[in-house]
Amino acid sequence: MSKTSTKGIWKVISASSMGTMIEWYDFYIFGSLAVVISTKFFPSDNPTAAFLSTLATFAAGFVVRPFGALFFGRLGDIIGRKYTFMATLLLMGGSTFLIGCIPSYESIGFLAPLLVLILRLLQGLALGGEYGGAATYVAEHAPAGEKGYWTSWIQTTATVGLFISLMVILATKSVLSPEAFDLWGWRVPFWVSIAMVGVSYLIRKNMDESPVFAKAKKEGTTSTNPLKESFGNRYNLKFVLLALFGATMGQGVVWYTGQFYAMSFMKTVMNVDSSQVDELLGIALLIGTPFFIVFGWLSDKIGRKYIMMFGMLFAILSYRPIYKAMYNTTDISQKIEIAENPRKTTEKKADGSSVTTIQKKYTDGTTVMEKKTYMEKKDVQTSVSIQITPNDKWALIFLVFIQVLFVTMVYGPIAAFLVEMFPTKIRYTSMSLPYHVGNGIFGGLLPAISTYFVSHAKTAGKADFYLDGLWYPIIIAGICFVIGMIYIDNKNKITHL
């Protein structure tokens, strides 16, 4: 590859990656603020139900992603890659900004969660069209034999988008008081996205169409009905189903377990301080992100199949030991409380409620803050926040990093794997659907399903209740591993590119 072509593809990578990263930021800022959002847009009389409702709304955005894949995939195979993922960028950015403008449940009642749900669905539709367009656009610019390496840069954007969402939240919290952030500051990360979208739109606007698609359009070989050709043709449908059940289904649950469920688990099951979770997760993501490129590059050398399959296998075998070790870092029953009276304060609120805060310290440096809110004619609401020690923080960073490493193994090569399975004229449509079903349905529902399993097991009195949420990703990844090992060919198919 010449110097000019190297410069050209870096321009393509930059434009595609920046836009896709912003869309992931927009999509995941909702999940990163799920604990706060549950208190703003849903009834506050049952915090657990409100949090589960927030996760369900978060999951709704994933459920519609396949529909976005079909709509925008068809559009991308007919009018082109460039203009399609420009449209998805604007739809995502506008929806995210408006979520930050919705009045609270206390102000407009059930209209608040309804508006959030509608905008969340629009976010899901937009993301359903974005990833396939960006991955296809980059792959169709990349030279033969290097598609794993170049498309792996797109694979970093989901993790980088999550990382930036955490950093924006931390930055906002650092300049505002806890009261101000809880009152209105949580809206700032949603508003910030509109500026980033504007910059990315201008960059994408000046990009050329994919040379492979432009050539096909000039020769008149583009599809007039990509949906029919993708799913009505038994030969193509076979590869769509193989991509889903032999790759993206397992990749989806590994991705969301290693990043989003890990975050949710630390905040809601382990009760680690929210800012500490954002910080340690951000560090683990920062350390792990380069491995997307490593495994994408390696897949060009040895094939995609075994890297992805072994990533799933390692995750299946390791999840329960990893999460048991995570839980034990904040298990108060294994720590020694300092023998002195806990600090106790009570604060009266203007609405007639009162908040009692009890602070306990332990010999290893752990601090536990327990807040009891006494509402008039309502049950007592209890929340616990644990400030972990530096040693425990680095232990958790390591345990999350291991999970991120599994993510990079299954996710780094998958864009190249998918685009190589389908011909140019139906590529956008054919690769988008299995990707977004695997990630949107199987992966996106994971936080809500796993949290429900944990909550149910805890209510049932199981000693290791906190591990029950892992059965879902273990089973799904296990099924995918078996199908992938049997039916996927390790030879990278490049005949379509």
Model-identified regions with their sequence ranges:
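C-terminal ends and interior cores of transmembrane alpha-helices
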Residues: 43, 90-109, 313-337, 382-388
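Multi-pass alpha-helical transporter architecture, strongest
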Residues: 200-207, 318-329, 472-497
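Glycine-rich segments within core transmembrane alpha-helices of 12-TM secondary carriers
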Residues: 126, 148-173, 196, 322, ...
